[in-house]
């Protein structure tokens, strides 16, 4: 019925807009550093293009692991190829993006279909079906309202890296803005690291349970742009992407593992951006209703940009944000409940696309902090090198970070772009 209702209103819509790409927020520079897409190859009536990368990734941990058997250092083969076909009339598009990571010692791996969709575009509307990634949010330090896709914690402990999500989605353009409708028929549980990997929770996470979730998750989103401001608001009804972790005990009463427990939710959320000269004001907030509780989460702050730093070509942005979260202790913990973030982003604007980003989040109630720093640079048109550091400090009182007290790490990645 949801899809039928969408199709019934398609005839009175405007330009299309389902791309699955971020709006407003800045992705990690490690993920964004790549050469321009290659020119598409002609295939009769349409065009075929391929992109992506493969490479080597090393993870270095300065501290010994908290759990026996975990890696001290890791070396991985990583690959993310993407191929897309666009018809001659540019109405049809088929896109496939795969991802794989394989450890060289010890031997284990993970793989996922990030995208595998067909999209049809008209001048006044578009329709998409298949696996896709959709990003919602505006802030830098935390993407609290991003809910369509499930998190892949094997790649990023904070949950910013997402699994592909099966969906049917339609975009309509009206005179006052844009409407998006989503039907998400298959729920995907959160992907947790294997027992050898780091960083991970001290207890292994196995299995999962979904409590009385709807057969199909649904979402509707509205986007309005006026002058220098952008506003997005959505309603989501479905299974919570953040599980409760229920301990399982042995015969002696000692916890031996955690089982994720997923509950149905209703969530209302919004994000906003407003440009004021060289200042960018941005924020996002949600109100979540579960069978057991109602709570809110919000992030808001400012970004101030400086162009042509010291008379050169470099641009720098200074960032400051505040994080708020009042969820109860029974829910998946937030990294910061009353936190502040300060950071910077540097674009050198040289021929090798050198970029850097660094920031610190401090949580006042737990006195914990997280530091992140990224740097990336193209060595040639096809090869790129990146460094990413994640550090945890004074996390003993943090529900979200206490298990990572010995898991600060540096990631070095060498990529060959396709």
Enumerate the predicted regions with their spans.
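Detector for outer-membrane/organellar transmembrane beta-barrel domains
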Residues: 276-363
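Residue-level signature of outer-membrane beta-barrel architecture
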Residues: 83-87, 119-122, 131, 171-174, ...
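Outer-membrane beta-barrel "beta-signal"
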Residues: 302, 404-418
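N-terminal periplasmic/intermembrane-space "pro-region" immediately following the signal or transit peptide
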Residues: 6-68
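Transmembrane beta-strand segments that form the barrel wall of outer-membrane beta-barrel proteins
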Residues: 54-64, 93-104, 114, 151, ...
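Outer membrane beta-barrel
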Residues: 84-197, 227, 394
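Residues that define the transmembrane beta-barrel architecture of outer-membrane proteins
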Residues: 69-77, 109-114, 162-166, 214-218, ...
């Amino acid at each position: 019925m949801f899809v039928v209702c969408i199709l019934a209103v398609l005839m009175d819509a405007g330009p299309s807009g389902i791309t699955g790409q971020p709006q407003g927020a800045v992705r990690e520079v490690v993920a964004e550093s790549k050469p321009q897409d290659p020119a598409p190859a002609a295939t009769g009536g349409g065009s075929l293009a391929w992109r992506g990368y493969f490479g080597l990734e090393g993870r270095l941990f300065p501290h010994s692991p908290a759990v026996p058997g975990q890696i001290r250092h890791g070396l991985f083969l990583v690959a993310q190829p993407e191929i897309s076909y666009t018809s001659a009339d540019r109405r049809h598009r088929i896109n496939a993006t795969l991802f794989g990571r394989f450890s060289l010692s010890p031997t284990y791996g993970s793989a996922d279909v990030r995208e595998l969709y067909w999209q049809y575009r008209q001048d006044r509307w578009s329709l998409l079906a298949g696996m896709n990634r959709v990003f919602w949010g505006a802030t830098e330090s935390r993407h609290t309202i991003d809910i369509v896709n499930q998190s892949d914690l094997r790649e990023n402990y904070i949950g910013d890296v997402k699994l592909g999500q099966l969906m049917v989605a339609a975009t309509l353009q009206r005179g006052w803005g844009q409407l998006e409708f989503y039907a998400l028929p298959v729920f995907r549980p959160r992907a947790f690291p294997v027992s050898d990997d780091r960083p991970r929770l001290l207890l292994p996470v196995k299995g999962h349970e979904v409590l009385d979730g709807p057969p199909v998750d649904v979402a509707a989103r509205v986007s309005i742009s006026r002058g220098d401001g952008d506003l997005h608001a959505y309603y989501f009804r479905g299974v919570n992407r953040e599980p409760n972790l229920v301990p399982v005990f042995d015969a002696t009463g000692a916890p031996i593992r955690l089982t994720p427990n997923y509950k149905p939710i209703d969530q209302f959320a919004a994000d906003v951006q407003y440009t004021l000269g060289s200042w960018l004001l941005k924020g996002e907030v949600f109100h979540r209703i579960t069978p057991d509780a109602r709570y809110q989460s919000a992030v808001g702050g400012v970004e101030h940009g400086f162009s042509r730093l010291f008379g050169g070509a470099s641009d720098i942005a200074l960032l400051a944000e505040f994080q708020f979260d009042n969820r109860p202790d029974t829910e998946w913990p937030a990294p910061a409940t009353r936190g502040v973030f300060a950071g910077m982003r540097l674009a050198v604007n040289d021929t090798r696309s050198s970029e850097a980003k660094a920031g610190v989040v401090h949580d006042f109630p737990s006195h914990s902090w997280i530091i992140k720093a990224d740097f990336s640079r193209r060595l040639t048109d096809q090869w790129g090198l990146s460094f990413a550091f994640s550090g945890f400090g004074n996390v003993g009182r943090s529900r979200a970070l206490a298990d990572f007290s010995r898991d600060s790490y540096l990631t070095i990645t060498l990529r060959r772009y396709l």
